[in-house]
Amino acid sequence: MTYKDNKILEDKKKNIVLFYPYISKKSSKLLKNRLNTRWVGQGPMVDKFENEFSKKFLEKKKCIATGSGTDALHLAYLLAGIKKNDEVLVPVFTCTATNIPLLYIGAKIRFIDINPKTMNICVEDLKKKVSSKTKAIVCVHYGGNMCDMEEIVKIASKYKIKVIEDAAQALGGKYLKKKVGTISDFTAFSFQAIKHITTGDGGLLAFKNQRLYQKAKRLRWFGIDRKKKQLGVWENDVKEIGYKYQLTDLGASIGYQGLLDFKKILSHRIKINEIYLKNLSKNPNIICIHDHDRKK
């Protein structure tokens, strides 16, 4: 993608284009290379993508790339130990993708109201509804505006329950100088077309407990250790029911250059946000969402 004539918002006379997926010209070279190797499924390019993401956003902690952000959330819920009939607290304002994996499991979703100033989970309502029945809290950082993680983590610690962040819209975000993906038990990211970077479609799961890494990899691919299989080990010890949730090398090739160009991508989005805030704030009929001072 190129930003035509350095215009921040391209005027289409009738409509302003909502977004363009960021796909670097350099990605085509990586894609061509993958096609020439004929390694188009999950392979070394996915490993390279995960390593670069970990280095840039997760303080070098291990993570797993998935076929979608929804896949990443489903794995997070499973790794958090959520089972059928478990109560999970979720913000009422979110994409259906946050909740659908909970329905796969058969969990009981209990909605928490949102703070109208941020569109994020309302901590006061969370305090009213959390109980000994609660298994986990899911929070969504709407529009890159970080939730009040200090309070949410404090509540979760009191009840000894897990916190799962849906950070589909918050790549590169920080809370009290901590990067999103390093704060809670689990954090799910999305690389769908409209996100900060795209892999065509894809996602990624980060987790605090690094001992879950091997299990997460198995759950991502039929409950099998895929690396051992690739090395020619024909005995497959299937330890649990797994899924087919892996990212492909083709998707990773598209997204890898986006990781390298992330600073430029984020800067461009911030400029667009500033234009909207500056102009829409003048309209008394429109309420604009602003970042909290402690959040970035």
Predicted regions and their residues:
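Active-site phosphate-binding strand-loop segment of PLP-dependent enzymes
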Residues: 117-199, 204-212
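PLP-dependent aminotransferase class I/II
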Residues: 6, 15, 21, 46-51, ...
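Phosphate-binding glycine-rich loop
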Residues: 39-87, 101-105, 111-113, 178
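Conserved coil-to-alpha-helix start sites within the AMP-binding
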Residues: 93-99
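Structural detector of well-ordered beta-strand residues that form the stable sheet scaffold
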Residues: 64, 89, 110, 162-164, ...
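A generic structural signal for well-ordered alpha-helical segments
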Residues: 102, 156, 280-281
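N-terminal "arm"/small-domain region of PLP-dependent enzymes with the aminotransferase-like
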Residues: 1-40, 237-239
